[in-house]
Amino acid sequence: MLLKSTTRHIHIYTAEVENNELIPSESVLTLDVDPDNELVWSEDALQRVYAKFDELVETYSGEDLTDYNLRRIGSDLEHYVRSLLQKGIVGYNLSSRVRNFSMGLPQVIASESK
């Protein structure tokens, strides 16, 4: 049975992707980060999210994969994305089709004047 956790910027499925289709799996989790491209990501920022995902999944190692546990992982990962945004590691994509500042208003960092 396909379980999923979806937040604004994090989608997790108990499935594998084959030919752009989700195939339910009891042993594989698939992570989709920011499917609507609301944020601007560097490769480093994405790798941080993947590493945090691996860390969170490891904390549930040995436990049953339940809807509740999957939602906890998704929620914790969404909070992690918010922390990356607040630190300026990722930013809002102002060219996105949707402008939803669900994690706070964009910040403009003033450059130092000489």
Swiss-Prot record:
Principal subcellular localisation of the protein: membrane
EC nos: 7.1.1.-
UniProt catalytic activity: a plastoquinone + NADH + (n+1) H(+)(in) = a plastoquinol + NAD(+) + n H(+)(out); a plastoquinone + NADPH + (n+1) H(+)(in) = a plastoquinol + NADP(+) + n H(+)(out)
InterPro entries per the UniProt record, alphabetical: NdhM
GO cellular component, as recorded: plasma membrane-derived thylakoid membrane
Role summary: NDH-1 shuttles electrons from an unknown electron donor, via FMN and iron-sulfur (Fe-S) centers, to quinones in the respiratory and/or the photosynthetic chain. The immediate electron acceptor for the enzyme in this species is believed to be plastoquinone. Couples the redox reaction to proton translocation, and thus conserves the redox energy in a proton gradient. Cyanobacterial NDH-1 also plays a role in inorganic carbon-concentration.
Subunit and interaction comment: NDH-1 can be composed of about 15 different subunits; different subcomplexes with different compositions have been identified which probably have different functions.
UniProt entry tagged with the keyword Thylakoid: yes
Family according to the record: Belongs to the complex I NdhM subunit family.
Topology term for the membrane: Peripheral membrane protein
Subcellular location(s) per record: Cellular thylakoid membrane
Pfam families: NdhM
PANTHER family hit by this protein: NAD(P)H-QUINONE OXIDOREDUCTASE SUBUNIT M, CHLOROPLASTIC
Keyword field: Membrane, NAD, NADP, Plastoquinone, Quinone, Thylakoid, Translocase, Transport
Enzyme's top EC category: translocase
Protein name: NAD(P)H-quinone oxidoreductase subunit M
GO molecular function term, any single one: quinone binding
